Amino acid sequence: AKVQAAWGAKTRGVLLASPSNPTGTSIAPDELRAIHEVVRAHGGLTLIDEIYLGLSYDEAFGHTALALGEDIISINSFSKYFNMTGWRLGWMVVPDAMVSVVERVAQNLFICASTIAQHAALACFEPESIALYEQRRSEFKARRDFFIPALNDLGLSIPVMPDGAFYAWADCTQAAKKLGVQGSWDFVLELMRRTHIAATPWRDFGSFETGHFIRFSTANSMAQLQEAIARLRRELA
């Protein structure tokens, strides 16, 4: 309904991210299908960022939107699930009619990926590599299962349990009051000063209902996350 209401004369499509950064939440399959049907009815394009798709922890999610039809544009990367951050290597799946157009754009932006990056990417699909990535995904889930409840207990409330990626999107309203500040920007600065814990304030993620939210990353080790909670507890408990 929101997509339908927002569609205007100049609208050409919808850009989605699932799982998303900063919330780590995914679009439910039924909701994604409904969105795509609205876009299709208007003759538009559904473009979806699936870069964190491999780091899904709920069986209800973790399935590519490409299953909805051949008119989906999917963007993905080797950076997250395949742990090749910094190699700047990814892929895009587009409808057949768009291939030649995308090729012209691509060859004027980056020509092609480096040889060493392509060989490294091929190694990602070896059984030994996949086993390592799946073990790593389980570790991310364990960190989430520890970190999110601990934040909630300290008054850094998580509105929706993340089902993917490695982030915690927390409302710092109550915690900021305990530190004598207001808003997420002042809160993260005070948090850094008191605990040496770095979090990302709302302003990096747009302006829609974000003013009292901050993002933590759970990409650190379990030991580091436990230490972070211990430091937060000393200030907020």
Where are the model-predicted features located?
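PLP-dependent class I/II
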Residues: A1-A237
